[in-house]
Amino acid sequence: AGLVKNLYMVNLVLNAEMLLSEIYAGHYLKSWEKACEAVDRIYRVDVPERADMIIASCGGYPKDMSLYQGTKTIDNVESGLKPGGTLVLLIEAREGGGPAEYFDWIQNWVSGTMEARLREHFTVPGYIFLLNCEQAKRYNILMLTSVAPETVAPMGLKAFSDIESLMKCAQPEGKKIYVIPNGSTVVPRVKGESL
């Protein structure tokens, strides 16, 4: 955008109900910054410290229709989770990974060629797949989902079809836990930390 002289931009900010909340227009950078401030004001929730565990729902269908869509919840809530912490993600994922090619990237991840291959043949689903794998390296991600455990195991994600097995693995006893019912529209942040 910076290459175009006198670029005028309109930024729309939606609320959690996906209704128009605010509009910012003008110089591309200034209107974008104002929109970012509005998003921060609308969606940020201050927390006193990072949690050992976050239990988050994507917010139901269509926000949890696939791992591709559910990534938004992981992105949002990780700012409130300690490194190495546990994320319990409630995501039906009735459409599996989402785009057909999402799980096609597994072999590249397992063989260690993911990043190089993605640089050669970039796709957004490939990028989201890589992002999910990298998140699974930073956090213990346990999902209550319809996705088969063996499908996501190579990514480092753990899938469960029943809450009892999941919670046994999560071991919540004695941990600082945040529960976020609509993780796709909530961004926890420790006061004073920047994203």
Kindly label every feature range from the protein language model.
Residues A1-R50:
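Conserved, well-structured core segments that form the ligand-binding/active-site neighborhood
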Residues L20-G26, S66-L67, E92, P99-F103, ...:
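Short acidic, glycine/serine/threonine-rich loops at helix termini
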Residues N15, G59, E92-R94, S146-V147, ...:
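Short, ordered loop/turn segments at secondary-structure junctions
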Residues S146-L195:
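Extended hydrophobic packing segments that form well-structured cores
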Residues D64-L142:
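C-terminal catalytic subdomain
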Residues A1-V4, V45-E49, S79-L81, C133-A136, ...:
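Solvent-exposed alpha-helices and their adjacent loops that cap or buttress functional pockets
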Residues D52-S57, V88, Y178-V179:
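Structural motif
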Residues K34-Y43, K72-N76, V124-C133, S161-Q171:
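A short, acidic, amphipathic alpha-helical segment used as a generic capping/interface helix at domain edges
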